[in-house]
């Protein structure tokens, strides 16, 4: 496989380029009989859509999804679901000046050396534009998980550049362009305005959470649930680090505090992030992502061209000054895809397993 498919039973194959006629995905393995309409998918795509605030790319794509197959009379048929999103606002001429050179920090250099050819328009296959089909597929997984288990997925930004964002409430997240869990985002708006004027970009940190995940999802060793979550999240453009639960903070913890005590009332903590031995505990799945600064910026930078000669690169076009601002719905989608895939795998192998004692509560705190 050439790395364009995520999942084993619930498998999502992504296709297209940033400035091609369309992008999309094919979902294989979705169970039959689930109610599904384009509106279910569109609601999630609208959360990720570009051009929604002055702090993201001004490329104005409607991201209208079309269901081409796999749904009949409003229900999934069990056959592959093909989803299409047409590109309508490309400006390929903006990239003519970098067609023969490489943007520092971008995939231009590695794509060219790997394939011997690259599409410079909007980053081609390496563009964050390709996260739209991921969100579309995630919407399908999200609906199935909610109906089957009551799983809820959510994400928020916890850091913008060097500015840490305190957690106030999940209720604030849908009401500001940063997906920030705070009521007042004026400080972050000013920060982004100054960044744009300086012709620069910044990174971000995100928190991603899944609630009501059943006990038992995940496989031992190489297909651990947390391993597959990390694998999926690293497929999100610009992600450079993934933590599960306490993550790297575990280094400074001791066994007496890191291990989540089990009581008849529930778990006393969740340093494990909802996964033990690669298998879900029934607690909240907690994931944290580190996202690097956008590599496409208007500030001049030193680089080389395809002939190995020194050159100066200035990126034109329309770009997100912080990829992390629109990453929350993408991260939720990736987590949904992984969870649905593992839920179907678990059902196939262990669906008949019945425990005499019910699982303990996720938490009694």
Swiss-Prot record:
One annotated Gene Ontology cellular component of this protein: cytosol
Gene3D superfamilies per UniProt: Chorismate synthase AroC (3.60.150.10)
Cofactor mode of binding and number, as noted: Reduced FMN (FMNH(2)).
First-tier enzyme category under EC: lyase
Pathway field: Metabolic intermediate biosynthesis; chorismate biosynthesis; chorismate from D-erythrose 4-phosphate and phosphoenolpyruvate: step 7/7
Required cofactor(s): FMNH2
InterPro entries: Chorismate_synth, Chorismate_synth_AroC_sf, Chorismate_synthase_CS
Entry keyword set: Amino-acid biosynthesis, Aromatic amino acid biosynthesis, FAD, Flavoprotein, FMN, Lyase, NADP
Residues noted as binding NADP(+) in the record, renumbered to the chain: 48, 54
Single GO BP term: aromatic amino acid family biosynthetic process
Catalytic activity, reaction form: 5-O-(1-carboxyvinyl)-3-phosphoshikimate = chorismate + phosphate
SUPFAM superfamilies: Chorismate synthase, AroC
Enzyme Commission numbers on file: 4.2.3.5
GO terms of molecular function: chorismate synthase activity; FMN binding
Positions with a binding annotation for FMN: 125-127, 237-238, 277, 292-296, 318
Subunit description: Homotetramer.
Family: Belongs to the chorismate synthase family.
Function: This reaction introduces a second double bond into the aromatic ring system.
Protein name: Chorismate synthase
Species this chain originates from: Paracidovorax citrulli (strain AAC00-1) (Acidovorax citrulli)
Gene name linked to the record: aroC
